[in-house]
UniProtKB/Swiss-Prot annotation:
<dbReference type="GO" id="GO:0045087">
    <property type="term" value="P:innate immune response"/>
</dbReference>
<feature type="disulfide bond">
    <location>
        <begin position="38"/>
        <end position="55"/>
    </location>
</feature>
<dbReference type="GO" id="GO:0031640">
    <property type="term" value="P:killing of cells of another organism"/>
</dbReference>
<keyword id="KW-1015">Disulfide bond</keyword>
<feature type="disulfide bond">
    <location>
        <begin position="34"/>
        <end position="48"/>
    </location>
</feature>
<dbReference type="GO" id="GO:0061844">
    <property type="term" value="P:antimicrobial humoral immune response mediated by antimicrobial peptide"/>
</dbReference>
<keyword id="KW-0929">Antimicrobial</keyword>
<keyword id="KW-0964">Secreted</keyword>
<feature type="propeptide">
    <location>
        <begin position="65"/>
        <end position="123"/>
    </location>
</feature>
<dbReference type="GO" id="GO:0140912">
    <property type="term" value="F:membrane destabilizing activity"/>
</dbReference>
<feature type="compositionally biased region" description="Polar residues">
    <location>
        <begin position="112"/>
        <end position="123"/>
    </location>
</feature>
<dbReference type="GO" id="GO:0031665">
    <property type="term" value="P:negative regulation of lipopolysaccharide-mediated signaling pathway"/>
</dbReference>
<comment type="function">
    <text>Host defense peptide that exhibits antimicrobial activity against both Gram-negative bacteria, such as E.coli and S.typhimurium, and Gram-positive bacteria, such as S.aureus and B.subtilis. Inhibits cell adhesion of E.coli on intestinal epithelial enterocytes. Causes rapid permeabilization of both the outer and inner membrane of E.coli, leading to morphological alterations on the bacterial surface. Binds to bacterial lipopolysaccharides (LPS) with high affinity, and may thereby be involved in immunoregulation through LPS neutralization.</text>
</comment>
<dbReference type="GO" id="GO:0001530">
    <property type="term" value="F:lipopolysaccharide binding"/>
</dbReference>
<keyword id="KW-0044">Antibiotic</keyword>
<keyword id="KW-0165">Cleavage on pair of basic residues</keyword>
<feature type="compositionally biased region" description="Basic and acidic residues">
    <location>
        <begin position="100"/>
        <end position="110"/>
    </location>
</feature>
Length: 123
């Protein structure tokens, strides 16, 4: 059992320590790999963490693809999407009562209990 408890953290930490064990990290829009030295037929396109090079196969034309493109808002025309995105406000009504009101209501519902007697203090 102790051996299992020692082996489990080692298996969890192994991919963190040894990069080859967990596989090389992807870079350059997932077309390259982070390595210390590029292999034959690969070109350095960028730098990765820990002073590694982003190695991309040089036989293909790799260009950075923009991740987002601006969407013009002025050219949009109202349509079915506007009907879907319309938010309708509704009002919910809640009845708020205090603890005192709740106690009075519960005492009135019991009917069998008597109220506490008045206590007079003499000075």
């Amino acid at each position: 059992m102790k051996l299992l408890l020692l082996a489990l953290p080692m298996l969890v930490l192994l991919p963190q320590v040894i990069p080859a064990y967990s596989g090389e990290k992807k870079c350059w829009n997932r077309s390259g790999h982070c390595r210390k030295q590029c292999k034959d037929g690969e070109a350095v396109k960028d730098t990765c963490k820990n002073l590694r090079a982003c190695c991309v196969p040089s036989n293909e034309d790799h260009r950075r693809v923009p991740t987002t493109s601006p969407t013009p808002l002025s050219d949009s025309t109202p349509g079915i999407i506007d009907d879907i995105l319309t938010v309708r406000f509704t009002t919910d009504y809640f009845e708020v009562s205090s603890k005192k009101d709740m106690i009075e209501e519960s005492e009135a519902g019991r009917g069998t209990e008597t109220s506490l007697p008045n206590v007079h203090h003499s000075s």
